Amino acid sequence: MGSEKEQSPEQHLPEEGERGNKPWRVDDSKVPDGEKEPGQANLSEAPQGPSPEEPTQEVAVSAAEPEDLSAHRRPEVDEKPFVCVQCGKTFNNTSNLRTHQRIHTGEKPYQCSECGKSFSRSSNRIRHERIHLEEKHYKCPNCEQSFRRHADLTTHQQDHLGRRPFRCDLCGKSFGQSSALAVHYRTHLEPAPYICCECGKSFSNSSSFGVHHRTHTGERPYECTECGRTFSDISNFGAHQRTHRGEKPYRCTACGKHFSRSSNLIRHQKTHRGEQAGRESS
């Protein structure tokens, strides 16, 4: 019958702009047609009525269920309501829009911890960092371990000797090089600008913050091709790969035992110092 609830679907289409009041949403009608992607034409400009090839299909939608109407129309219209104000390109979510806008702003927030090169996308930074895993020009004369930087080789050689003579008087942490101590010391003096919004912990550089933030997100972008195990940071990923190759480059000069990680060697060498202290006291 002709009740007031039985109205044509066109009377209940949501008006443009009703999807939210976010500042990056722009009325599609204000975007020049030449700058829209295919499928972005206004509904008001779409051909009315059925096409000659397709039969007319009646769809009954209740006025009390507008969400059902929205779900019904979604497959018919490729909605991309987020528009770049610089070039007019459209996107279906704010994340893709923000990533695109870095092309215009030149922003590159993702920095390589090895060489300092910056990238606009996290995925590009991760792909770049894998290159450094293959670049190891500095070889230790005491073992088969090679390093990407001369500073890393120098620090490694201190591990062979079991020495970390440079100690921070504020927290007690020790380092094999004075330059490493100087870098560390600045973390006590300078404010840490990178603050985690999840737990409030602060960091002095974006690389350390990125590694920490993955503990909250669960992101583990480094995957071992041998066993499929994943890691959140590149250093643990590299150490894990040595287990597949059987590499144990860290050698104890006191007993000749080898280790795959420098931290394990340092822990082991403390047992020798404890034995020596016991003999001297007896």
UniProtKB/Swiss-Prot annotation:
Region entry Disordered, spans: 1-75
UniProt keyword Phosphoprotein, yes or no: yes
Biased segments, Basic and acidic residues type: 1-38
CC annotations in GO: nucleus
Keywords annotated in UniProt: DNA-binding, Isopeptide bond, Metal-binding, Nucleus, Phosphoprotein, Repeat, Transcription, Transcription regulation, Ubl conjugation, Zinc, Zinc-finger
GO BP annotations listed: regulation of transcription by RNA polymerase II
Phosphoserine modification, residue list: S8, S44
Secreted as UniProt keyword: no
One Pfam family hit: zf-H2C2_2
Cross-link (Glycyl lysine isopeptide (Lys-Gly) (interchain with G-Cter in SUMO2)): K80
UniProt cross-references to InterPro entries, sorted A to Z: Znf_C2H2_sf (IPR036236), Znf_C2H2_type (IPR013087)
SMART domains: ZnF_C2H2 (SM00355)
Stretches annotated zinc finger (C2H2-type): 82-104, 110-132, 138-160, 166-188, 194-216, 222-244, 250-272
Family: Belongs to the krueppel C2H2-type zinc-finger protein family.
Function: May be involved in transcriptional regulation.
Protein name: Zinc finger protein 691
